[in-house]
Amino acid sequence: MMNKIKGYKAYNNMNDRFNNSYEIGKEYYIEGPIKFKERGFHFCKNLEDVFRYYNGFDENTVICEVEGFGEIDTYNDEYYGYYDMYASSNIKIIKVLSREEIIDIIINRNIDSIKRFISGFKLTEEEELIILNKFKEEIIEKYIDYYQKNDEKAFTKKRSW
């Protein structure tokens, strides 16, 4: 039985950086040796990590749930704390995630994942409140102020409480 790894991949209007188009429910294959950062269908196990490679502030960015299989190369960047990133010879596009699904997934992650997500994905005011209500730590408020509201002084402000 073939190992399948579920993960997430970002596209620009369902096109990759080479302008290849992808469709929901279809499987794709690439020949040749698979190596992360070189060749293969790249995806991340953790949703927040896709924003290392795609701009989540761009309204054309689409986030998909995918399955990678076939030949798989795993990459971990311990220095920056990115783990379980893959390149695979085969990929299936399961579905496009709605904003609600993205928030539902990310809200159940740890605080470091939330910080990474806030720094890479444009949130609505309602989504900011959902995150602030779940994570009441001051650092989350600072991340939202800095990355979402462009407040360059967010990390130097003294809070009154």
Segments predicted by a language model, with ranges:
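Short, glycine-biased loop/turn motifs at secondary-structure junctions and
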Residues: 1-161
